[in-house]
Amino acid sequence: MSQIALSRARLPTTLEISVTDEFGEPHRQAIAAERALTLYLNRREIVTLMTLGAEPEALVVGYLRNQGLLECVEDVEAVQVDWEVEAAAVVTRHLPEDLEARLSQRTVTTGCGQGTVFGRLLDATALTPLPPTRLAQSVLYRLLDNLGAYNETYRSAGAVHGCALCQQDRVLDFVEDVGRHNAVDTLAGRQWLEATGSEGEADIFYTTGRLTSEMVLKVAQMGIGVLVSRSGVTQKGVELAERFGVLLIARAKGRHFQAIHADQRLILDAPPPKRPGDRDAARARRKTSGARG
């Protein structure tokens, strides 16, 4: 890969403010940073992202990659971030011939912190179903336990999402940002810029955010067949996951989870002990679900 002219514009992810607690006592509290960063591709304004500012170069490259506006890292000549003007300039050797057409086909999504996806990606015909990846329940539990050590910004300040590339129960790479889509884009950009190879090793993607259509699309583009979240799933996310062969694990907290499109891919080798009332609670959830349907 040719050398990229890359700025190093990392900023602190938290700052302290004065707050008053419920007893009227003043104290200092860490809060998550949130900064606007306008992305320019060969002087063409693309989007303004709200970000922590931890890895802005990786974020903008990953954004362009995941939106289908950048086909390979070898096309990138320079990535320069200037926080004084809140801008990131990406210079490439080539641009998609239909760039203007792609930019005109933006769809507002349910993603917080970003919320757009280009029409070419929603068409989804360019993506083929992924080979099935099997996941053992015991591996999922170990992974969830291991992930607890990585949410440093969330523990100190809250108000951020985290995403991770994982190989079974091993965390390969972890990123936090104010939006879950920023976090996945930063991971994608980091893998390209650092050429670490961990994306190729990853078979599980973890996010703290909802499993929406945009999240499923981005993970499918990365070739990862298992998507895990501590949050819930949307209708379009379920539909696209079925099309691409992505196993969804939603509401994964502690020893609880909800698997979608599991088929024979989820190996139930570590069922947790049932507690009094679990059966009644499950029956009530099924009854409520049936009434809503």
Model-derived regions, located:
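General structural feature for long, well-ordered alpha-helical segments within catalytic domains
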Residues: 55, 136-139, 143, 159, ...
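Conserved catalytic-core subdomain
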Residues: 215-293
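Short, solvent-exposed amphipathic alpha-helical segments in soluble enzyme
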Residues: 54-55, 64-66, 179-181, 188-193, ...
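Glycine- and Gly-Pro-enriched alpha-helical subdomains that act as flexible
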Residues: 154-209
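Intrinsically disordered, low-complexity regions enriched in acidic/Ser/Thr/Pro/Gln residues
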Residues: 2-162, 166-168, 172-174, 293
